[in-house]
Amino acid sequence: MTQITERELKKKYLDLLSQHFDTPEKLATEIINLESILELPKGTEHFVSDLHGEYEAFQHVLRNGSGNVRAKINDIFKDKLSTKELNDLTALVYYPEDKLQLIKCDFQNYGQLNVWYITTIEHLIQLIKYCSSKYTRSKLRRALPEQYVFIVEELLYKNNEFKNKKSYYETLVNQVIELKQADDLIIGLAYSVQRLVVDHLHVVGDIYDRGPQPDKIMDTLINYHSLDIQWGNHDVLWVGAYAGSKVCLANLLRICARYDNLDIVEDAYGINLRPLLTLAEKYYDADNPAFKPKKRPDKHERLTQREESQITKIHQAIAMIQFKLEIPVIKRRPNFEMDERLVLEKVNYDTNEITVYGKTYPLKDTCFQTVNRDNPAKLLPEEEEVMNKLLLSFQQSEKLRRHMSFLMRKGSLYLPCNGNLLIHGCIPVDENGEMESFEIDGQTYSGQELLDVFEYHVRKSFDEKENTDDLSTDLVWYLWTGKYSSLFGKRAMTTFERYFIADKASHKEEKNPYYHLREDVNMVRKMLSDFGLNPDEGRIINGHTPVKEINGEDPIKADGKMLVIDGGFSKAYQSTTGIAGYTLLYNSFGMQLVAHQQFNAKEKILSEGIDELSIKRIVDKELQRKKIRNTNKGKELQAQIDILKMLMHDRYLD
């Protein structure tokens, strides 16, 4: 094969580029456009984390832009509208379809309604004009309702200086109303406002877990205009299950059974659980208290006795399968250092005791009827058949394929973005703050390099779904539960102990030292440097651990260098945190941390217009307003400009 020199490659590239920019005027126009964009203020970044399947609460935070929508409305209208009018306009932007129906019921005749239409369209146009003031016209156009772009642009850029077009603008709006298009236009404008107040969304992990509707969250994210995802431990568990890890699949199903969320698997993703139920009905009892499903906070009606009985049996069946499946993985991967988790081999089945970490405990609520004492890892033929069927169903689910592919496409283990490091869990360190090493395939890795290797194997496992026992697939499970995992962040997962040992001391899961060292500003600066970021300007933005504000914990740590934004969307954690978690806004003026109150119901917002927000705390204020030039996007644009200028000099100026 002929070797192409760098010079020849550059010439071929410029030749291709010149086909698109075939005149100096076209090329100059593009350079001028890109250079000008660099001088615009950076767009607003919105950081959310730990959604845990709580679709309703997440939807609300997305619709209100963590309070950004109301702030913009107040900026323009606070001295012009009454409190009720402000509240109504806010609710209309958040939930346009629902609020429109309520408002229309208040009017007695079409004349009153038409006046309201004219006023509301004018208010929304003003709001869009304000929210889009730092965008180019082409970017704004992409955010407008597609079918009404012409009308909206005419109203946005109206200039009646010489009084020649007054009748024209009035006719535009009147015809919209007369032709019954006002509702759709208002709905479209409301969604344009939502889109304009947030330029880019960062989801810092855990879309999945115990909440009831992660699939709806995924559908919402797929349709969102601009985002990235940093995988959480629960996200990787789902990826692992889809990629062929039966032990990940068993874990996932056990969690769904424990939190009465099997309908995610059955109804949302169309997975048939009947074979698992048949197995469970054959071997397990319905009255094991350790395996009764937890009450779901979002479910008002109680489970029937039959439903509870079936879930309790399924819960036991899949837990036993999980503990069996863990054994061969641990044994074939001695570098995982997980021998203490060979729990079924450590049980004394005669005395009903277990010895773990050098201590012997009596066992309660046991369900070992399918365990072979001489070979605890051995699955019954029925268990093996059930897991094969379930794995095939998972991999054949079109909806799950779409969601997992999107997670892989938009996701990563960590992301350096605009000078900050976004990471869900932790950077594994020892007590001295040194990066912990982990051996993979005969080579030792730590820090950023370790995370890069983990991510490589997640992607490899996903691409080779037919391989279920290879190193890559086992490493996806290790990310869920291993002591050097950046996602788990603890020394061991004590699932077995929580089910079967009464002594709660055995349930304790020791956290990686990262979680107390992240309070230290020098430690955080060192981590930022290790990831190639400027420690003077950068921050680590972290999810995964609920901030217990109720106990005085502060989400702003290490002199503002570490921000913990576990969204607290999971209702199960809200009693221990005291709030419904944090989100973060980062615009050209600086960063604001937003503390959310518990989201009760959108009905309250629709009727009263009072938002469940949210206390904003300024993390910092930029001394100089940040421009697109100072962002990752700015670097990309600058690289494009450099190439275009090279073409200009090569073809037209020299």
UniProtKB/Swiss-Prot annotation:
Stretches with biased composition (Basic and acidic residues): 298-307
Assigned EC number: 3.1.3.11
Region (Disordered): 288-307
An example Gene Ontology molecular-function term: fructose 1,6-bisphosphate 1-phosphatase activity
Catalytic activity as recorded in UniProt: beta-D-fructose 1,6-bisphosphate + H2O = beta-D-fructose 6-phosphate + phosphate
Name this polypeptide is given: Fructose-1,6-bisphosphatase class 3
SUPFAM superfamilies (alphabetical): Metallo-dependent phosphatases
Species of origin: Staphylococcus aureus (strain MRSA252)
Keyword Magnesium: no
Cofactor(s) required, per the database record: Mn(2+)
UniProt entry tagged with the keyword Hydrolase: yes
Pfam short name (any one): FBPase_2
Keyword terms: Carbohydrate metabolism, Hydrolase, Manganese
Pathways per UniProt: Carbohydrate biosynthesis; gluconeogenesis
InterPro entries in the record: FBPtase_class3, Metallo-depent_PP-like
Family: Belongs to the FBPase class 3 family.
Single GO biological process annotation from the record: gluconeogenesis
